[in-house]
């Protein structure tokens, strides 16, 4: 469909150049092309793929017509999710399936409004899962928030349709005046380094079950994700971890000396 009148350039404070779309394990090349076209229509230029099952260029370009072909030429392809989202300070997961382990926390429209202050100083990734099953719980654990598209009944949408809905809401929010900008948030590389450090220390002091450390770590992730952490706050938490690690090491040395002394016996 041709548009008779294009919208004027962005006048709000949501920075579209800081929005990235990440398609995780997409299966149908035509959906990749259609998603790129939807993104281009709404002013979003960053597209990444993670382990695409089929990325046959000829089929992709059938639906990525016109200028959106540039997005296909510039898109990045990754073997794992973390390298794809590592540079982003805020990550959004999308899902049609909601439940106790994946509570829907926002809608596309509310999300777009919430992103206005965040995008001033942070890059934001919006993740979409494979067509047949969506994002897994392992994918969603990297996300700051989970968004769900409300529907009247049948909740399954075509991948490109879902991308268009989110991109449209983000574009419309970019035309509205925004509030106070969020400072720079910790990116996913920094956050995952913190979580790894925290898990190692909590295992060392006996807080986590070494046979199943991820059980409590999932709860800790949820707790710490309620408010996006700034880079400075991540450094503080890692400083606490280092101090706990040092103290645990001192206790271990002290216990070792006591065992050594006890083994010597009386003179």
Question: Which residues does each predicted region cover?
Answer:
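Post-transcriptional modification and biogenesis factors for structured RNAs
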Residues: 1-267
